[in-house]
């Protein structure tokens, strides 16, 4: 009888955590649904810039851009009618923080990304920042994550590109937890 009770409690706890934890995290402000005004910018161009750094310090642990810090702005810009390009410091495949897609952290935009072959191709084949002219974009967005701490702030090329875009009156922004 005691084993059956323990099993019932364990199953109930697992179900609560699996189904209830995401709702609780949303209630506390993690990945809330935004129900504000929807803005349209048809014909606009946005550039999302991410890290190329894939390892957390000397730990050997995989890292990169935090999923939702790249996917949420991508879909906001895309849904607003903008053309969206994706670039990284070195170009090529963008490393994504593997923990950012775990069920309790994944945002709706992350789930959308996992079903979007067009965006996935952009992430696997990102443009190299030095091959771009940032002044040709209306918005330049820097996506955060642990990897960004290793190369975004130390890239002279990124610094120059952002400086030119800002001087040209472009919108420059970013996010990092």
Where are these regions (language model features)?
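Extended, subdomain-level signal for the structured scaffold at the beginning of enzyme domains
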Residues: 1-168
């Amino acid at each position: 009888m005691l084993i059956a009770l323990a099993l019932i409690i364990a199953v109930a706890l697992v179900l609560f955590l699996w189904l209830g934890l995401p709702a609780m995290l949303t209630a506390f402000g993690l990945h809330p649904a935004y129900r504000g005004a929807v803005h349209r910018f048809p014909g606009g161009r946005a550039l999302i810039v991410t890290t190329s750094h894939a390892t957390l310090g000397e730990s050997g642990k995989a890292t990169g851009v935090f999923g939702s810090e790249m996917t949420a702005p991508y879909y906001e810009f895309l849904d607003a009618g903008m053309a969206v390009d994706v670039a990284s410091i070195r170009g090529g495949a963008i490393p994504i923080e593997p923990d950012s897609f775990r069920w309790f952290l994944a945002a709706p935009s992350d789930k959308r990304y996992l079903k979007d072959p067009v965006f996935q191709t952009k992430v696997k084949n990102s443009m190299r920042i030095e091959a771009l002219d940032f002044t040709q974009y209306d918005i330049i967005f820097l996506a955060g994550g642990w990897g960004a701490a290793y190369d975004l702030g130390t890239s002279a090329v990124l610094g120059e590109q952002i400086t030119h875009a800002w001087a040209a009156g472009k919108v420059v922004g970013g996010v990092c937890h």
